[in-house]
Amino acid sequence: SSSHRDEKYWLRHIIEGVLALCPQASFEIFGEHEIYKLYRDLPRVSVLHPMTWQNYLAYTKTHRLDIGLAPLLDSGFNLARGPVKFYDFVRMGAVGIYSNRSPYSDFIEQNVNGVLLENDPQKWIKALSVLVNTETKRSELARNAKKHAYSLANQ
């Protein structure tokens, strides 16, 4: 959404770095034309047009990802967020990499059901590259995230 505009700009350097290190990696990002222009020169990056909540929910139920990215930069708006991306990523079978801040820092168990990182682009490039290249770790974290989501739903 447009509320993540700054994060999409912040991610560009990270995505470019991972693409250079991992030729098998590809990325999808939601964004308006401004975001398309920002990413159009990068190979293996698709910019998807924003969609209604109903369509997005259907998309996350039928689309599979390996890794989801949920950076949160400093802003008043981000202070009020819930861990929604965790559930989106679980629906898509993915492990998430999250900024180590609320709401994720109190919700994600580090390297058990997700990865928490400070907002240091080099750390994101390294962690993302490791997960891209380590299918067993990706799968383990995604399985644990799914178990965590189900345990919360059954409380």
Where are the predicted features?
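Conserved catalytic-core segment of nucleotide-activated headgroup transferases in glycan assembly
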Residues: 1-62
